[in-house]
A protein has these predicted regions:
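N-terminal binding-site loop/beta-alpha segment at the start of enzyme catalytic domains
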Residues: 1-81, 152, 237-241
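Beta/alpha (TIM)-barrel catalytic core signal, keyed to glycine-rich beta->alpha loops juxtaposed to Asp/Glu
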Residues: 138-326
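Active-site mouth loops of central-metabolism enzymes
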Residues: 19-29, 96-108, 132, 137
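Structural motif corresponding to the early beta-alpha repeats
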Residues: 73-103
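Short, acidic/polar
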Residues: 27-38, 106-121, 167-174
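Aromatic/hydrophobic pocket-lining residues that form the small-molecule binding cavity
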Residues: 31, 66, 110, 114, ...
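Active-site groove signature of glycoside hydrolases
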Residues: 118-139
Length: 326
């Protein structure tokens, strides 16, 4: 497993991370097996969020399962990195209508939720805490108070953002100032073969061929993150972005799966491994967040972290996924 430095921090972590959004559906033994599988493949970075508990309909549920699982798997706290996300309020009171009620970057909300996460995870600090989605009502003094309080108390070592555009990140960083402890080190964004808009937007710059619609929805996120030395963390990299779910082995995406199978045969690995390798091939040094709770499938995905795709193979897969080369 290759390691990468997260942002400008001194943290050298595995380039693949385990995301535990669905871990609340597992019992203790199954969760420990998933964590153990990840660790055996070199993973030392684990990503969660305060709202992950959609199966059991309860806040902090996945974090609580992870908090036991990393210990049951025989891992030591000093050997792993734990990351959580906060800033969304979910109403779980009606199991048939679970929904977000607001985004909340108030100091009180962020500090309270982080404390609850620490208790759930069974630790007294997290290595990274990310603002989960942008709060349009966020206020500078509230963000600064929350981050400063949490860092000085030793509860959060580094910070980051998730699902924000470049200008939102710039605004936040302008409030937080130049203190290295307040740097936004990571930016978690959806990215994968069938969610490659960050790339297609940049390829389409100054392009407008007949029949080609050009619209930039990512605001230059890819280049911005590289310029600011923010590590992109790719979430849901195997999702198709459609009603059909994951794309690997899915009959609704025959061209992509044909290409994946061809490359898998060439490199002697699974299609899942190739899909992982595609994300990690980009020189932006993206960290992939894999969320499979199936140990066999997770192992196949993680095998891709050791593959260096040929450039042409990378482009072949990009096109097979329905993306255009202008």
């Amino acid at each position: 497993m290759k390691s990468i430095v997260i942002g400008k921090s001194a943290v050298g972590a595995s380039q693949a991370a385990l995301g535990v959004m669905r871990m609340d559906a597992l019992d203790a033994d199954a969760a420990a097996e998933v964590v153990r599988t990840a660790a055996e493949h070199g993973v030392n970075f684990f990503d969660t969020a305060d709202i992950y508990g959609f199966n059991v309909k309860h806040d902090h549920a996945s974090s609580r399962v992870l908090g036991r699982a990393w210990k049951d798997a025989g891992l030591k706290r000093e050997d792993i990195f734990l990351q959580t996300k906060f800033g969304i309020n979910i109403d779980f009171s009606d199991p048939n209508n679970v929904h977000a009620t607001r985004y909340d970057f108030s100091a009180k909300h962020l500090i309270t939720r982080l404390d609850e996460e620490l208790e759930a995870l069974g630790t007294d600090y997290v290595d990274f805490a990310l603002l989960h989605r942008p709060d349009t009502l966020m206020e500078a003094e509230e963000i600064v108070e929350a981050f400063t309080t949490l860092h000085k108390a030793g509860k959060v070592r580094h910070f980051g953002v998730s699902n924000v555009n470049p200008w939102q990140a710039e605004l936040l960083q302008s409030w937080l100032g130049d203190d290295p402890a307040m740097r936004l080190e990571a930016s978690q964004l959806q990215f994968g073969l069938m969610h490659a808009q960050m790339i297609s937007d940049e390829l389409m710059t100054n392009s407008g061929a007949e029949g080609m619609v050009v619209a930039n929805h990512s605001d230059g996120l890819l280049s911005y993150s590289r310029l600011r030395h923010m590590t992109i963390q790719a979430w849901s990299p195997f999702q198709s972005g459609t009603e059909y779910g994951p794309f690997v082995g899915n009959e609704h995406f025959p061209e992509l799966n044909k290409a994946l199978d061809e490359k898998a045969a060439k490199y002697g690995v699974s299609a899942n491994a190739i899909a992982t390798a595609w994300v990690l091939r980009h020189p932006a040094k993206i960290q992939i967040v894999l969320g499979s709770m199936n140990p066999t499938r997770l192992g196949e995905m993680l095998d891709g972290a050791d593959i260096d795709l040929d450039k042409q193979d990378w482009w072949d897969l990009y096109v097979a996924a329905g993306n255009l080369i202008p």
